[in-house]
Amino acid sequence: MPVSVSDSFVFRNIFGDAEIRKIWSDENRTQEYLNWEAALARAEASLGIIPKYAGEEIQRVCKVENIDFSKLEEETINIGYPVLGVVHQLANLCSGDSGKYCHWGATTQDVTDSATVRQMIDSFKIIKGYLEKAIELATVLVIKHRETTMAGRSNLQQAVPITFGFKMARFVATLRRHHQRLCELLPRVSVLEFGGACGTLASLENKGLMVQQKLAEELGLLQPEIAWHTERDRIAEAGCFLGMLTGTLAKFATDIKLLMQTEVAEVFEPFKANRGSSSTMPQKRNPISCVYITASTSFVRQGVAALLDAMVEDHERATGAWEIEWIVLPDVFVHTVGTLKQTVFLLEGLEVHPSRMNENLSITNGLIVSEAVMMALAPKLGRDEAHDLVYRLCHLSIQENKPLVELLLAERQVTNYLSKEEVTSLLNPENYLGSTFEMIERALQIP
């Protein structure tokens, strides 16, 4: 019976999808073990290390449907690792004496690590697809809302004007950096593990590296320069990438949650009848995808910390740290795909309300562009004096609930240097966007 949201019948397609779950399933992992054993047999048979007939027979029986999972569970509980249980069944499935050549010169971790690498590669293909879709959809929003002026916020308060396109362009630029990181990461992760007991391949005498090369070619992996049984930087780096990627998605979801607040109401998740509704408050439209994203990404970040712990291993084969990866990797990959899936859903139907953004720009009576006035006065009064003057008038605007323009035009220190037309122009949010449009163009042109 499922106990985790990753495989719960109710929650599994919220926090992941069927494709990623299949990759990390018992059946697929075991098939990867069998793929490894078949590839090893082919490589060793081609080099004359085991008989050709044995290589062919081992390959013939390396199918997951031949595995008795009840027996495998029983042996794994007793041994502590599933690979030997698979090898025992494999040997018994082979005809004649072929079974005695199974797993020749290998060790459990060689099989497990290589299978994990192949699972990660397949997982990264899914992640890359979702990531590219998110970039495409976010770019559409950048272009559409390039000039949609809104309040930029600092410490949750209105700061200076930006455009929604600018906000989304920053998101696109970050996603593109993650795409670049993923492309750079894949060659470092896609490496075979095959070193035997302590990494030296001593059991294969002078043919160890030849077998290693052929095995890597058979599995579509890179040959390692040296064994990495207790050097876990590859796995940790993969985990850190997932943590960074999902951290970016959580930042995006957090912004959407805040923009959905009743008092703000500038952006909303896609509408679907009853989605995000409350059991007691009929008016509610909760940011449900954003909630799933922020919850899942928190879990992923904790998993990354565990993967970093797993780097601290003893000697050439470790006592316990390695098993952390077994626990963590399936769920962090599933939850990463889940967050990407929810992000794509958001981007496909995100509701943007320019009129509400424009309304919110005016709620401070012009204070959102007070910096523009200060900078216009600074060359005349000096920056500090200009700051103090505008600060005083902003405070007065708040106290008396008066438009800033009215107070500025009543202040001699302002009118001595700025005309009414200049003050009015300075207080137009659309005139204080700086290099917004140039930066948007640069963000979109990044290859």
Swiss-Prot record:
GO molecular function, one term: carbon-nitrogen lyase activity
Keyword field contains Cytoplasm: yes
Matches recorded under InterPro entries: AdenyloSucc_lyase_C, Fumarate_lyase_fam, Fumarate_lyase_N, L-Aspartase-like
GO cellular component assignments: cytosol; nucleus
Gene3D superfamilies documented for this protein: Fumarase/aspartase (C-terminal domain), Fumarase/aspartase (Central domain)
Keywords: Cytoplasm, Nucleus
SMART domains per UniProt: ADSL_C
Residue stretches spanning the membrane: none
Localization of this protein: Cytoplasm; Nucleus
Main location: cytoplasm
Family: Belongs to the class-II fumarase/aspartase family.
Protein name per the record: Uncharacterized protein C8E4.05c
